[in-house]
């Protein structure tokens, strides 16, 4: 059976492995838990979905909704949505898919359902090839041999790890816009007519109320993207 190393446990890595045939797969993750940037932040009794807010029902990935429901990772909610708050667009009801216990439930439950061993808190610093086999190195450990290695990580991290295998000179580097995320809690309900929407102001592109996803805290929490 082929031995496969997968670096990263974000949604791209988990989706990839979910669609592979039965192989000897080992995950490597620099963080302490799976999920990558699909995370849920906790502070005292508050919960904030940070990095991704929800899944659209019509995202186009065939079979995903049914599978996530089967592994009890998600729930479907209806919320009041405004497409352009600043321009006073009409508020409409919109159905979205959210995590059972925060958006992190999606990667956590998907990772658990795969059942493959994972080396957490293991940042791969070097990838070596010897006699058509691959070895992975952290600061103090070496793993291998592997027949194949899948790197599921942001471009900059992949370039640092794979520049001895891939000529990046002819590959255009992606350019990203910075998004700032603010997680804020109020000691009372604000009575907002919507739960989520776009363009509150020229500087606030999106915001979402966390209470309609997590009704077990009494104060009001919002995640704001700028």
Regions found by a protein language model. Give the residues of each.
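Glycine-rich FAD pyrophosphate-binding loop
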Residues: 7, 19-43
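Central helical "cap/lid" subdomain
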Residues: 35, 143-195
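Short beta-strand to alpha-helix junction loop
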Residues: 54-62, 87-109
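A conserved short coil-to-beta-strand element within the FAD-binding core of flavoproteins
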Residues: 120-134
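Active-site substrate-recognition segment that forms the wall
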Residues: 183-226
């Amino acid at each position: 059976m082929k031995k496969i190393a997968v670096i990263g446990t974000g949604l791209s890595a988990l989706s990839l492995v979910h669609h592979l045939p039965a192989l000897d797969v080992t995950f490597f993750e620099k963080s302490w838990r799976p999920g990558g940037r699909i995370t849920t932040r906790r502070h005292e009794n508050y919960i904030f979905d940070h990095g991704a807010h929800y899944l659209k029902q019509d995202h186009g990935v065939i079979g995903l909704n049914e599978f996530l429901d089967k592994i009890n990772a998600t729930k479907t909610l209806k919320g009041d949505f405004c497409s352009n708050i600043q321009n006073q667009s009409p508020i409409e009801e919109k159905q979205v898919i959210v995590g059972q216990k925060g958006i992190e439930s999606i990667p956590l439950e998907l990772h658990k359902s795969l059942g493959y061993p994972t080396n957490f808190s293991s940042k791969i610093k070097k990838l070596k090839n010897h006699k058509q086999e691959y070895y992975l190195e952290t600061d103090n450990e070496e793993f291998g041999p592997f027949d194949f290695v899948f790197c599921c990580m942001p471009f900059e991290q992949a370039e640092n790890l794979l520049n001895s295998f891939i000529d990046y000179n002819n590959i255009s580097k992606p350019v990203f816009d910075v998004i700032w995320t603010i997680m804020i809690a109020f000691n009372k309900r604000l009575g907002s007519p919507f739960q989520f929407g776009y363009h509150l102001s020229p500087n606030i592109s999106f915001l979402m109320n966390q209470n309609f996803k997590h009704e077990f805290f009494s104060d009001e929490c919002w995640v704001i993207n700028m």
